[in-house]
Amino acid sequence: MKNKIQLKINYALVLSAATAVYGYKSYQPTINTLLIKDEENWPFFSKRQTAFIPIIVLKKNHQNP
């Protein structure tokens, strides 16, 4: 039983990391283009790097004896 739970947690962490890398690579050019267009209104944001990082919340099941 613990092996199945550990496998699911490992799968979730790998999936989260892969999504973060893919999201960062695909989102970065888009956000740079959008911020360059709006640089006059928000110059602070044009100098910052932005990344899409998904967050997975793992909930532990508690069973009362």
Swiss-Prot record:
Keyword annotations from UniProtKB, A to Z: Chloroplast, Plastid
Predominant location: plastid
Location within or outside the cell: Plastid, Chloroplast
GO cellular component: a single term: chloroplast
Superkingdom: Eukaryota
The protein, known as: Uncharacterized protein ORF62
Native source organism of the sequence: Pyropia yezoensis
